[in-house]
């Protein structure tokens, strides 16, 4: 897709996987615009139009630190869930939120759908480019992606995670970030 964007001098490229419930974009400079950046673009735009319910974005614990910092800069709250679009949707429904997404590509616009929809995501990206008159590269530059390593850690006793002292330490560390 990157080569096609360059060869065709396109403003962007948008790709979908098998069942098209996810989207990935490439800007005109051939940079991949991942789901964290896409959801950042959407949250900022929706806040500007008054469409970001309760001024809040729902995402998972796997989101990049850059997304959290960008949302903080734009005074947008973040609700984090465990990994999985079903948890994102559950939190959106419980809180009455309009936008949620996860790093794997599922982005949910509750105004239009109750599941991740890659075609809808692609249309939203195009709409933001048209509405703002900015390229995808310019829109994506709102967020800096920080290096990130995701490691699956087996956990036999999940009750240890609920320990109040541990939760306090996690909250303190998150506040420092």
Predicted regions and their residues:
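Anionic group-transfer/hydrolysis microenvironments
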Residues: 17-19, 29, 62, 104
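Phosphate-binding and adjacent anionic-ligand microenvironments
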Residues: 12, 49-177
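Short glycine/threonine-rich catalytic loop with a Thr-x-Gly-x-Asp
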Residues: 16-18, 32-37, 113-116
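Generic hydrophobic alpha-helical segments
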Residues: 1-5, 43, 88, 173
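N-terminal small/polar loop signature for handling phosphorylated ligands or for N-terminal nucleophile
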Residues: 1-26
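Short, acidic/small-residue loops that bind anionic groups at enzyme active sites
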Residues: 31-53, 82-84
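Short, well-ordered alpha-helical scaffold segments within catalytic/effector domains
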Residues: 2, 40, 166-170
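Short Gly/Thr/Asp-enriched flexible loops that form oxyanion-binding sites at enzyme active sites
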Residues: 21-41, 67-68
């Amino acid at each position: 897709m990157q080569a096609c964007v360059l060869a065709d001098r396109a403003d962007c490229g948008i790709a979908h996987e098998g069942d098209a419930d996810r989207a990935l974009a490439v800007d005109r400079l051939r940079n991949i615009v991942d789901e964290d950046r896409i959801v950042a673009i959407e949250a900022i735009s929706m806040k500007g139009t008054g469409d970001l319910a309760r001024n809040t974005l729902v995402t998972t614990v796997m989101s990049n630190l850059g997304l959290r910092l960008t949302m903080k800069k734009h005074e947008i709250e973040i609700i984090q869930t465990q990994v999985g679009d079903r948890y994102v949707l559950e939190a959106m429904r419980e809180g009455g939120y309009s936008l949620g997404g996860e790093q794997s590509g599922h982005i949910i616009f509750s105004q239009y759908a109750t599941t991740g929809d890659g075609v809808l995501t692609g249309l939203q990206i195009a709409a933001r480019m048209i509405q703002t008159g900015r390229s995808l590269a310019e829109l994506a530059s709102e967020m800096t992606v920080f290096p990130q390593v995701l490691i699956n850690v087996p956990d036999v006793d999940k009750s240890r995670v609920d320990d109040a002292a541990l939760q306090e330490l996690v909250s303190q560390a998150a506040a420092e970030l």
